Amino acid sequence: MAVGLLLLAAGVGSRLSSSLPKAFVSVGGLDLIQWCLKNLGQLRTALEVVVTVPKGFVELCERNVLQSLGTLEKIKIVTGGATRQDSVGLGIRYFSARITKLLVHDVARAFTPPEIYLSVIKQLETSKAVIPVIAIVDSIKKVNMQDAYREVARGPGEPFHTKSVLHLDRREFFSAQTPQGFDRALLEAAHERSVASNEQFADDSVMVAQIEKDITLINGHEASFKVTNPCDLQRAEFAASSLLSKSNVSPVNISQPPISALSMPLPLIGVGIDFHKFILDESPLFLACLEWKNYRRLQGHSDGDVVAHACTTALLSAANMGDIGSVFGVDLAATKDASGAYFLESTNRLLATNGFCVLNIAVQVISNTPRLADRRVEAEHAISDCLSGARISLSSVTTDGMGFLGRGEGIGAIAVAQIYHR
């Protein structure tokens, strides 16, 4: 039985609020796709692998694979489609003719344990379709589909207007996970049908079920959660830390003897310092990517966000790319009143283009006012959102009345950033 593995990494991660596609978001020093490859290391099973990535990210993915595997042999990295279903349809074309069974896996489920892959492969010996599922722990409520889309769009905490609610027994329902396994011929036939009917399905099991009702279910795993929203990154960080603490985790080996253990890349460290004085202006203060009403604005060609500027210089310094002034200029029309988020997001893209990823930034704010502790967590999240979910730590201190900062003439910030090169 010749098995192929299709890794879907073409999702843009819009709900993750990341400037990078989801597969290339850093968690614990590695991108999600690298964790996915790392977790496959214990399979010891010969697999032919195809990876679908967004347009323009083939080269970056190749670097990820080389760092994880040391080789591109048996790996094909191709550009995916506009939807998950399109990416699957494109990806299955790249497997060699000898492949008779296919596993389809979302890279967003980067921490799926090896035993789940092995269980799916084992069941494919006697089944045409195999789906890992996990019990639902929450109570289930059913509403009209159009009502659901409208109500969810209203945002967290907002009351539903619809009253058409059915209360379902959760014991009858399970959540589907990946990898999902299929006979190759069955999956290809299901895709041909979906193209002909112009239908879109939530996943491959739903699509295959249109022509094959006999689908085998196996128990999935809690670690096979899907990274979808920013809060999922905290869970992913915990999973990454757990894996790094295990000495028996080795890099993925698809068809060759084990290679040396994947080591964490050495961090590159940069320091950024910035100061701005207060001015009399009707505009509000901008600090740490937040607007602070009823506080004096900081002077600057841009919005004067001293925290964002210090972080930007720290990141550029770590990458040996200069500082905020040398990269963005000091008086360009394009950066007039530019926000701190603009500088951080632009720097994040610049780093990513050059193969860097942000690990974390620690920032010390020096000022008498405003009181940063009141909005510290909010500010950390705002900066993190600009940097693909990187960890941010903000703290503040005064000078006990000494110097121009002690006299309340302005605000200073010192930032230390850690990045790594893929």
Swiss-Prot record:
Q: Which PROSITE patterns match?
A: ISPF
The record, for InterPro entries, names:
IspD/F (IPR026596), IspD/TarI (IPR034683), IspD/TarI_cytidylyltransf_bact (IPR050088), MECDP_synthase (IPR003526), MECDP_synthase_CS (IPR020555), MECDP_synthase_sf (IPR036571), Nucleotide-diphossugar_trans (IPR029044)
**Record's keyword annotation contains Transferase:** yes
Q: Which cofactor does it need?
A: a divalent metal cation
Keyword entries, A-Z:
Isoprene biosynthesis, Lyase, Metal-binding, Multifunctional enzyme, Nucleotidyltransferase, Transferase
Q: Which positions bind a divalent metal cation?
A: 274, 276, 309
Q: Where is this region: 2-C-methyl-D-erythritol 4-phosphate cytidylyltransferase?
A: 1-267
Q: Report which superkingdom the organism of origin falls in.
A: Bacteria
Which Pfam families does the annotation name? IspD (PF01128), YgbB (PF02542)
Q: Which residues form the signal peptide?
A: none
The function of this protein is:
Bifunctional enzyme that catalyzes the formation of 4-diphosphocytidyl-2-C-methyl-D-erythritol from CTP and 2-C-methyl-D-erythritol 4-phosphate (MEP) (IspD), and catalyzes the conversion of 4-diphosphocytidyl-2-C-methyl-D-erythritol 2-phosphate (CDP-ME2P) to 2-C-methyl-D-erythritol 2,4-cyclodiphosphate (ME-CPP) with a corresponding release of cytidine 5-monophosphate (CMP) (IspF).
Q: What is this protein called?
A: Bifunctional enzyme IspD/IspF
